[in-house]
């Protein structure tokens, strides 16, 4: 078993009292949207193949979907872009700037991870999950980066802002 039994660090699996920590944030909307998308996919599969419901519950399906979401690698195999689950490669923690690169080596028929710099013996090997804002890290991977800054000082964190116009505002007509 190389996949986690629980994904309780991911907010779509949080209890209602834990979700109160996110009150007022756009992340709550994204969590609900993700739950709805997973429920709709589950329903579509069950509608097409009713026996699926006897094999897999919505909770199990949600767990599997989030395992894929948090652990798949985009790769190119023989010129075809695809995604792959790569056991143990998904155990690398996130760090920026990037210290490794990964690819599918067609000549070896293997997924490879290459260090981009010297890593001391016994040192942790990191992967970069990309330049993302903390709400994406939390939604998709179950963690946030304390000082989420790039080397150039850029901070990819985003803040969603809802702006409502009064019905009589001329911009409303546009």
Q: Where are the model-predicted features located?
A:
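Long, positively charged leader/targeting segments at protein N-termini
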Residues: 1-174
């Amino acid at each position: 078993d190389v996949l986690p039994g629980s994904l309780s660090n991911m907010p779509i699996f949080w209890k209602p009292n834990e979700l109160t920590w996110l009150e007022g944030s756009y992340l709550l909307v994204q969590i609900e949207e993700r739950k709805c998308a997973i429920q709709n996919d589950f329903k579509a599969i069950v509608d097409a193949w009713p026996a699926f419901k006897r094999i897999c519950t919505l909770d199990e399906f949600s767990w599997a979907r989030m395992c894929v979401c948090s652990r798949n690698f985009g790769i190119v195999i023989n010129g075809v872009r695809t995604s792959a689950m790569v056991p143990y490669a998904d155990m690398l923690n996130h760090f920026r700037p990037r210290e490794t690169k990964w690819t599918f080596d067609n000549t070896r028929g293997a997924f490879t991870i290459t260090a981009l710099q010297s890593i001391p013996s016994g040192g942790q090997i990191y992967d970069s999950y990309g330049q993302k804002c903390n709400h994406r890290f939390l939604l998709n991977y179950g963690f946030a980066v304390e000082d989420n800054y790039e080397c150039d000082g850029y901070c990819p964190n985003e803040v969603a802002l809802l702006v409502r116009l009064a019905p009589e505002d001329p911009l409303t007509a546009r």
